[in-house]
Amino acid sequence: MKITVYCGATPGNDPSFMKEAHALGAWMAREGHVLVWDTGLMGAVSDGVLDAGGNAIGVIPHFLQETEAPCPLNYNGRLVKEIVDDMPTRRNRMLELGEAFIALPGGMGTLDEISEAIALAKFDMLKRPLIVMNVHGCYDALLQAFADMVVQGFMTSEVLERVSVATSAAEVAALLS
């Protein structure tokens, strides 16, 4: 399965974010899943995948190649890099490739990406697993906002039920197994 992972462009200030990202990558490799990723905290996911002998597809806009490019090595062909024109093209390509979607801790870009995936699920345009990885409660407020949207009539409970929540790589593994 190709798993698209969204997360912060920086590692954040809690070391457990990097630890869980790496653990997620290692699990993906052990199970034969392919990582679809970009940069930032996702580098820890790709390290986990590639260190464990797995495969990854790095999708990055050309303007970020210098500052946030995926690893320059190709790991004997196990790392495929796709250079795209811009961020919307990157986002669309990652949606196209992914057979499951995981949001690790991140900022506005991560929120944008997982929100788009949820919006597509609302219209049945995306019928693949959506997982929010709520490491150390980093998404508690977001998950509460989603629940509030249901109460206030801006989201249906059926859409919210399409989003699974995990707190660790082990829980993600259980959800996708």
Predicted features, each with a name:
Residues 1-97, 135-177:
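A cross-family phosphate/adenosyl-ligand binding-site feature
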Residues 89-123, 131:
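Active-site/ligand-binding-proximal alpha/beta "capping" segment
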